[in-house]
Amino acid sequence: MAWAPLLLTLLSLLTASLGASVTLTCTLSSGYSNYKVDWYQQRPGKGPRFVMRVGTGGIVGSKGDGIPDRFSVLGSGLNRYLTIKNIQEEDESDYHCGADHGSGSNFV
């Protein structure tokens, strides 16, 4: 059976008001529904910061250091969701998802 290359898709721009909730979606390509995805937060001028890993059953392992309980994840089918509740100013960042598939890593 031939496998298609792993492709991750992430919405490129999302805005939210302070105190609101937002959900980011990272979508895996067909055939990769069992893969785990790592979420990262990257503030301007800083390196990526690990948020947490998510599989089909939800969080895998622990949240990254200092990640508040307002951040949560969920996995369903090909989608891996990162939800941030009660948005705060310090949450303003670029968010990336990445998957390690054995022969390398893909990030968006």
Feature annotation, model-predicted:
Residues M1-V108:
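Extracellular domains of the immunoglobulin superfamily
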